[in-house]
């Protein structure tokens, strides 16, 4: 297991070097964005950050229905970006055009597109059907994942004990209240458990407000709290949750029951993420930010469940180390 992890570290370093070379030698190109009106500004901003493509989107078409000139508009560009809010008919037209015109295309997936990922073909007489993957782990995957959790969490606890001791002293010196903060979260199969964290907020921070997501520049966060949140040190006690079998090293982040109820009302498919154990880190944490929308995080979580493997978990662990030095990833909601 450890030799495999070392090989993955070398592979990660090599991929990073190749990625940086690709960015520096990327040829100039331009693109067109087809999307819904409500997502246009956000997608244009986000796509502009890819590979430093600040001027990648030259034109935005909010709706192709009734627009007879959309193909001639697209002819001028190298890339086509497709938003999530377009209806299926519009997406089909754009994709058919893009393939015939040999355009490079990118699409923001919806739950429907996610469900069609990694499907297998079934022939019913002469009718092709796709078998949609169930969002469940096999018995073998569960065993291997548990073995990885134990083999990582025990050495991590031993190595990080001095850091956790220093954090304990710093929290005690900085503000009144307990060092360890436990909070009810929703875990696998919807069962609740208490997650452990180093306290980063003032004692009884939500006594009057009730459950509230942390905001950027939140006054409830202590001085030490800002540092341990930025470096994710506040999450270290969750290694004991992993040892207890309540969490995994990698998986969807556990959320509070109050917010889970809200999210499920808005998006019933949010419940799918409870088919696996919650994690200390996950694909949503390395690909998104703290203030990434719940829906976008859900897409990442479902991608992870479909792609789960020991290799995937090890890659996410390594990517997490890179994310730790990015302050923007820990900013609160605005």
Locate the predicted segments by residue.
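Transmembrane alpha-helices and immediately adjacent membrane-cytoplasm interface residues
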Residues: 1-25
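N-terminal hydrophobic signal-anchor/signal peptide
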Residues: 16-161, 332
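Short, glycine-rich, amphipathic interfacial segments at transmembrane boundaries or analogous
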Residues: 112-113, 119, 181-220, 281-299
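A hydrophobic, helix-centered structural microdomain
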Residues: 141-204, 241, 310, 316-334
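A short, structured surface patch at a secondary-structure boundary
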Residues: 214-277, 316-324
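C-terminal terminal-structure detector
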Residues: 244, 258, 269-334
């Amino acid at each position: 297991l450890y030799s495999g992890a070392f090989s993955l570290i070398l592979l990660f370093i090599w991929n990073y070097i190749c990625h940086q070379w690709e960015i520096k030698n990327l040829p100039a190109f331009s693109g067109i964005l087809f999307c819904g009106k409500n997502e246009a500004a956000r997608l244009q901003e986000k796509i502009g950050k890819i590979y430093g493509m600040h001027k990648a989107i030259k034109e935005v078409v909010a709706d192709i229905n009734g627009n007879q000139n959309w193909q001639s508009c697209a002819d001028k560009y190298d890339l086509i970006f497709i938003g999530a809010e377009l209806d299926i008919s519009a997406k089909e037209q754009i994709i058919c055009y893009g393939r015939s015109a040999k355009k490079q295309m990118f699409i923001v997936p919806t739950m429907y597109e996610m469900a069609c990922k990694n499907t297998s073909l079934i022939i019913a007489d002469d009718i092709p059907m796709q078998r949609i993957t169930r969002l469940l782990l096999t018995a073998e995957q569960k065993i291997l994942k548990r073995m990885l959790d134990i083999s990582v969490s025990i050495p991590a606890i031993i190595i990080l004990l001095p850091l956790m001791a220093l954090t304990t002293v710093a929290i005690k010196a900085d503000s009144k209240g307990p060092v360890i903060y436990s909070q009810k979260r929703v875990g696998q199969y919807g069962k609740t458990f208490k997650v452990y964290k180093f306290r980063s907020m003032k004692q009884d921070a939500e006594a009057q407000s009730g459950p509230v997501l942390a905001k950027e520049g939140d006054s409830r966060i202590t001085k030490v709290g800002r540092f341990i949140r930025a470096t994710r040190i506040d999450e270290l006690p969750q290694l004991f949750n992993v040892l207890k079998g309540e969490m995994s090293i990698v998986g969807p982040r556990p959320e509070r029951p109050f917010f889970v109820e809200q999210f499920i009302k808005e998006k019933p498919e949010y419940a799918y993420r409870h088919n696996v154990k919650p994690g200390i880190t996950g694909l949503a944490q390395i690909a998104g930010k703290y203030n990434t929308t719940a829906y976008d995080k859900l897409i990442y979580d479902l991608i992870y469940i479909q792609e789960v493997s020991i290799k995937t978990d090890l890659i996410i662990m390594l990517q997490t180390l890179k994310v730790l030095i990015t302050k923007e990833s820990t900013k609160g909601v605005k």
